[in-house]
Design a protein with these regions (language model features):
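Intrinsic-disorder/low-complexity regions
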Residues: 3, 38, 49, 73-78, ...
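Glycine-rich catalytic cores of cysteine/serine-nucleophile enzymes that process amide/ester linkages
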Residues: 3-76, 104-112
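Amphipathic alpha-helical interface surfaces
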Residues: 57-61, 81-84, 117
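Acidic/proline-rich low-complexity IDRs
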Residues: 43, 77-79, 140, 144
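A structural motif
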Residues: 76-101
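Activation targets extended, charge/polar-rich intrinsically disordered C-terminal tails
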Residues: 94, 99-167
Length: 167
């Protein structure tokens, strides 16, 4: 089924705890978490958090977790099927320790990027046939979405989906 999809940036401080502070310091950025949301009935979000496979949760549960959405980027309509849900459930687990090690030392020694919320978004869109860059930090994603030449964030049908602030 075709559903509208968005990349959403959230303040995940209540869930990230000490990882929130370290990621902010190591990336010199206020952006620490992003995930995909789909306008299904009811709306769902696919999030990746420390030590767990990707989780599919309802939008209502996000509000109960006391996390705050501060920006969304509409990426248009995507076909959502059983293959997508299998992809979500089989995506590699995120490890905060690996992410922090990568930020502090690993990137200087050619370490493979650890899985995180942004690599999940990029990998999923590549799975859907998009030509998107390999990004790692929420700051890189934010800058790429807001670049003057953000043509890479067009769907395979080449629609340019513009960003908008969450009301």
């Amino acid at each position: 089924m075709k559903v509208n999809a968005k990349i959403c940036f959230y303040k995940f401080k209540p869930l990230q705890a000490w990882r929130y502070i370290l990621i902010r310091l190591l990336t010199n950025s206020k952006h620490t978490h992003a995930h995909l949301e789909f306008n299904t009935e009811p709306p769902i979000a696919v999030i990746v958090i420390d030590g767990k496979p990707a989780q599919i949760i309802s939008g209502a549960l996000l509000s109960k977790l006391k996390v705050e959405k501060y920006y969304e980027y509409d990426i248009g309509d995507l076909d959502l099927s059983a293959n997508d849900f299998n992809y979500f459930l089989n995506y590699r687990k995120v490890s905060a320790a690996k992410i922090i090690f990568y930020y502090t030392l690993g990137r200087f020694f050619g370490m493979k990027k650890a899985a995180n919320c942004v690599t999940f978004i990029c990998d999923y869109l590549k799975f859907k046939g998009w030509d998107v860059p390999d990004l790692f930090s929420p700051k890189e994603l934010w800058e790429s979405l807001h670049a003057d030449n953000n043509d890479r964030w067009k769907s395979p049908s080449r629609q340019n989906n513009t960003s908008q602030m969450d009301k």
